[in-house]
Amino acid sequence: MNKTNPTIALVAGEVSGDILGAGLIRQLKAHYPNARFIGIAGTRMLAEGCKTLVDMEELSVMGLAEILKHLPRLLKIRKNVIQTMLQEKPDVYIGIDAPDFNLDVELKLKANGIKTIHYVSPSVWAWRQNRIHKIAKATHQVLAFLPFEKAFYDKFNVPCRFIGHTMADAIPLKPNRAEACQMLQIDPAQRYLAILVGSRGSEVEFLAEPFLKTALLLKEQFPDLQLLVPLVNEKRRIQFESIKAKIAPNLDLHLIDGNARQAMIAADATLLASGTAALEAMLCKSPMVVGYRMKPLTYFLAKRLVKTDYISLPNLLANEMLVPEMIQEECTPELLAEKLSAYLSDDESAVKNRLVLIQHFTDLHQKIQCNADKQAAQAVIDLLEGKENV
């Protein structure tokens, strides 16, 4: 490797990966001003100077049916990436998330003497744990957002570096509620519940009804309660409004385009589906209840495949049931309302419990606030310069 102008390959498959890639390139340019960046990039990585082989949107498909439909195209892109990388011989290949695409590329490149890093651990600690053996063969190092992920890799002697979470860097330890209310143009003197029904169509389909019925029950108990419903895009908004028209046509809601983070910062409590939103709610210091429903067969299989005691990231990070998880049969309006009312109540004990929970959230936030972009760049530099065990 030329120490001053390495060729660094990065492949991102969706917007979240493009954000990570752009932050990583920015930090790497500070160390290697003449580095060359190639791969598959979105608009943010392109703005940082990465040359892309194809439009990143070509990789951005979700759901099994959609993947099968586009499989020939995805396989062609993967073959093209492998051929290009074997010709270009980059000093390192960084697969950013998209494990179903990137791990096969990494496997081929590592076998041909190219250094590889997988940025963002697949949820191998939770399910399909046998993937760890493929990851070990495919990568020189995994960059993990969360400390329990590194602990899992350590058990299998797979090189892994905990770098902290970029979201923990982006959200302040003490979020500004007044500022969030101003951005949303809502009255900070009111009491708010944020309702996040998920970003996927299937989540909205299964969760909109119990979440709306929960809101109706809570409005009876807290008549002044205001409801904030951020929706990720127009498609999900139309889907949600259609369900609301049947379930709760007269329920007054603040429907918000995007801005889930501001809604959670402004809210006194949050009702949400599991996933990254639960981590974001924790970082926003919003007491939450996690509700999740899926098809009975999917749940039957998931129960047998998932190897963790909890499904939400705050509980996994704390290794205890910090926030209620109401899954499948327990995801009922009555139980959800009961758990949320404990956060919304003005009782002295409820206020105290809320403060204790927020302190727990703050402690966990500090654990994963490590300047992840810089840590990721340092891991790449160490691998390039032969110091990966430092």
Swiss-Prot record:
<keyword id="KW-0441">Lipid A biosynthesis</keyword>
<comment type="similarity">
    <text>Belongs to the LpxB family.</text>
</comment>
<keyword id="KW-0328">Glycosyltransferase</keyword>
<protein>
    <recommendedName>
        <fullName>Lipid-A-disaccharide synthase</fullName>
        <ecNumber>2.4.1.182</ecNumber>
    </recommendedName>
</protein>
<keyword id="KW-0443">Lipid metabolism</keyword>
<dbReference type="GO" id="GO:0009245">
    <property type="term" value="P:lipid A biosynthetic process"/>
</dbReference>
<dbReference type="InterPro" id="IPR003835">
    <property type="entry name" value="Glyco_trans_19"/>
</dbReference>
<keyword id="KW-0808">Transferase</keyword>
<dbReference type="GO" id="GO:0005543">
    <property type="term" value="F:phospholipid binding"/>
</dbReference>
<dbReference type="Pfam" id="PF02684">
    <property type="entry name" value="LpxB"/>
</dbReference>
<comment type="pathway">
    <text>Bacterial outer membrane biogenesis; LPS lipid A biosynthesis.</text>
</comment>
<dbReference type="GO" id="GO:0016020">
    <property type="term" value="C:membrane"/>
</dbReference>
<dbReference type="GO" id="GO:0008915">
    <property type="term" value="F:lipid-A-disaccharide synthase activity"/>
</dbReference>
<comment type="function">
    <text>Condensation of UDP-2,3-diacylglucosamine and 2,3-diacylglucosamine-1-phosphate to form lipid A disaccharide, a precursor of lipid A, a phosphorylated glycolipid that anchors the lipopolysaccharide to the outer membrane of the cell.</text>
</comment>
<keyword id="KW-0444">Lipid biosynthesis</keyword>
